[in-house]
């Protein structure tokens, strides 16, 4: 495994192919824990992981906390409704409170883009050793979700060796609300870095044509792209055309809470044009894995029958894989010195 160089994890645009391989390899080793019966490792014993979630979350928060506990870390969970934020305390002061209590890792989720980066930069300026892991910020990024989706696909294509090479040359369709999705943005960086060609599909209001250039240049403030030869990224409007020849498809939740009024005329029409079902997938000619980062609007992004068919979709695998992926990230970030014995 190559040396880990990321002090904070804020965005997958900074990841090299070797970084993806390091995370997936470690996650694959951690995923063997339930099989061997070993429920905990002493790797992060004595470390404190604090989950600072300023947005509601079920899967991500629970997954991070379970991951930390399986590595024997102590966990402190922050809730805005019962915190001093309601008394006027700033977000930075809240974070510093956890740093003062000895937090080694802050997992931060916030509705505003850039908050995890701002906290990381503030801690760097004062020389704190605490590191920040982005648990999802605004429309910007959701690194751990992008990584677990990548791992789920690699696991499907090569169960015994689920590494980035399993994605090279694959055709992956992402359909739905790309505009409002931090998950989609993280997946675009991850999938193209591993050599997959990505086809985006949806109405122009949710998949602007400009997304075809999303990975063409590094983000502002980043000098260069750590991946020299990314996969292709294209936008296709017709879902049947997009699915023809696809190796996998991911459908995204319609984030109605982030939409302006009248962005969609009808949910029924959306499902008819862009929803997934057993019937729609027949255009693929061969079975392909169906992913969804959750939560699912049943009967909108995916038919109820397809969602209930665990042989056709990988939704539960995504949830399951969140734990070893987040264990890998916490282990790498905390620079644990305990040897692994899986």
From Swiss-Prot:
UniProt cross-references to Gene3D superfamilies, sorted A to Z: Aspartate/ornithine carbamoyltransferase
Residues annotated as transmembrane: none
To which pathway does this protein belong?
Pyrimidine metabolism; UMP biosynthesis via de novo pathway; (S)-dihydroorotate from bicarbonate: step 2/3
Q: Which is a Gene Ontology cellular component entry for this protein?
A: cytosol
* Residues the record lists as binding L-aspartate: 87, 182, 253
What is the main EC category here? Answer: transferase
Entry's EC annotation: 2.1.3.2
Q: Which InterPro entries match?
A: Asp/Orn_carbamoyltranf_P-bd, Asp/Orn_carbamoylTrfase, Asp/Orn_carbamoylTrfase_sf, Asp_carbamoyltransf, Asp_carbamoyltransf_Asp/Orn-bd
The protein's matches in SUPFAM superfamilies, at most eight in alphabetical order, are given as:
Aspartate/ornithine carbamoyltransferase
Q: Where does carbamoyl phosphate bind?
A: 59-60, 109, 142, 145, 294-295
- Any GO BP annotation: amino acid metabolic process
Q: Which reaction does it catalyse?
A: carbamoyl phosphate + L-aspartate = N-carbamoyl-L-aspartate + phosphate + H(+)
Quaternary state and interactors: Heterododecamer (2C3:3R2) of six catalytic PyrB chains organized as two trimers (C3), and six regulatory PyrI chains organized as three dimers (R2).
What is stated as this protein's family in its record? Belongs to the aspartate/ornithine carbamoyltransferase superfamily. ATCase family.
| Role noted for this protein | Catalyzes the condensation of carbamoyl phosphate and aspartate to form carbamoyl aspartate and inorganic phosphate, the committed step in the de novo pyrimidine nucleotide biosynthesis pathway.
The protein's name in its UniProt record: Aspartate carbamoyltransferase catalytic subunit
Organism encoding this protein? Synechococcus sp. (strain WH7803)
């Amino acid at each position: 495994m190559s040396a880990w160089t990321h002090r904070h994890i804020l965005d997958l645009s900074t990841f090299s192919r070797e970084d993806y391989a390091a995370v997936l390899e470690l996650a694959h080793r951690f995923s063997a824990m339930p099989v061997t019966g070993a429920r905990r490792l002493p790797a992060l014993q004595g470390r404190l992981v604090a989950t600072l979630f300023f947005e509601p979350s079920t899967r991500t928060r629970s997954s991070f906390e379970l991951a930390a506990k399986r590595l024997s870390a102590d966990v402190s969970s922050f809730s805005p409704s019962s915190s001093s934020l309601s008394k006027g305390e700033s977000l930075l002061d809240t974070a510093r409170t956890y740093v003062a209590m000895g937090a080694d890792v802050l997992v931060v989720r916030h509705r505003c883009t850039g908050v995890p980066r701002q906290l990381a930069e503030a801690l760097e300026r004062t020389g704190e050793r605490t590191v920040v892991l982005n648990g999802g910020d605004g429309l910007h990024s959701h690194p751990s979700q992008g990584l677990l989706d990548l791992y789920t696909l690699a696991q499907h294509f090569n169960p015994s060796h689920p590494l980035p090479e399993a994605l090279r040359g694959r055709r992956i369709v992402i359909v739905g609300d790309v505009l409002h999705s931090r998950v989609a943005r993280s997946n675009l960086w991850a999938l193209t870095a591993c050599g997959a060609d990505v086809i985006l599909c949806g109405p122009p209001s949710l998949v602007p044509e400009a997304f075809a250039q999303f990975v063409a240049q590094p983000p502002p403030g980043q000098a260069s792209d750590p991946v020299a030869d990314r996969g292709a990224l294209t936008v296709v409007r017709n879902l049947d055309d997009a699915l023809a020849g696809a190796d996998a498809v991911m459908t995204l939740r319609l984030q109605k809470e982030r939409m302006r009024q009248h962005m969609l005329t009808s949910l029924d029409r959306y499902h008819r044009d862009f929803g997934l079902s057993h019937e729609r997938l027949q255009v693929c000619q061969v079975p392909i894995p169906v992913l969804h980062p959750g939560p699912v609007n049943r009967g909108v992004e995916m038919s109820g029958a397809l969602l209930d068919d665990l042989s056709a979709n990988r939704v539960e695998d995504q949830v399951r894989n969140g734990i070893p992926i987040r264990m890998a990230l916490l282990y790498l970030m905390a620079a644990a010195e305990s040897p692994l014995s899986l």
